């Protein structure tokens, strides 16, 4: 009888130790989720501040080129974000930004723009 209770206590203790070990283990999925949430919020803010091409004066080559380049870099950032965070709230706009980025890249080349923005390169 004592052996029987000893085995139960040992099994219970083992279960508790396993549960503690699992609770203390690092959780990369949660960390990744937090990074994705933070980046999604940052992207939302950045998107609201993007310069619009239709507002740029068409005759001002420098402003048009910088506007195009800014939006191209944003499209790359969005693409990189969606590659890391496919369940992002921005996923539904991913295809639109990919097309927009391609169109702006073509316009950037047609206008013979030169890259002027340093820093983020996606």
Q: Where do the model's predicted regions map?
A:
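Bacterial N-terminal signal peptides that target proteins for export
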Residues: 2-16
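Intrinsically disordered, low-complexity segments enriched in glycine/proline and serine/threonine
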Residues: 7-10, 30, 72
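Cleavable N-terminal signal peptides
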Residues: 18-19, 29
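Residues within alpha-helical transmembrane segments of multi-pass membrane proteins, especially transporters
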Residues: 21-23
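Post-signal/leader-peptide non-cytosolic segments of secretory proteins
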Residues: 32-122
């Amino acid at each position: 009888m004592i052996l029987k209770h000893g085995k139960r206590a040992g099994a219970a203790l083992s279960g508790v130790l396993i549960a503690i070990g699992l609770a203390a283990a690092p959780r990369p999925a949660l960390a990744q989720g937090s990074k994705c949430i933070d980046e999604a919020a940052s992207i939302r803010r950045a998107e609201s501040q993007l310069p619009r091409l239709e507002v740029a004066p068409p005759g001002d080559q420098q402003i048009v080129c910088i506007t195009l380049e800014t939006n191209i870099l944003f499209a790359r950032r969005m693409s990189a974000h969606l590659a890391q965070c496919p369940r992002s709230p921005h996923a539904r706009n991913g295809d639109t930004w990919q097309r927009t980025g391609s169109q702006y890249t073509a316009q950037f080349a047609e206008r013979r723009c030169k890259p002027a923005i340093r820093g983020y390169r996606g």
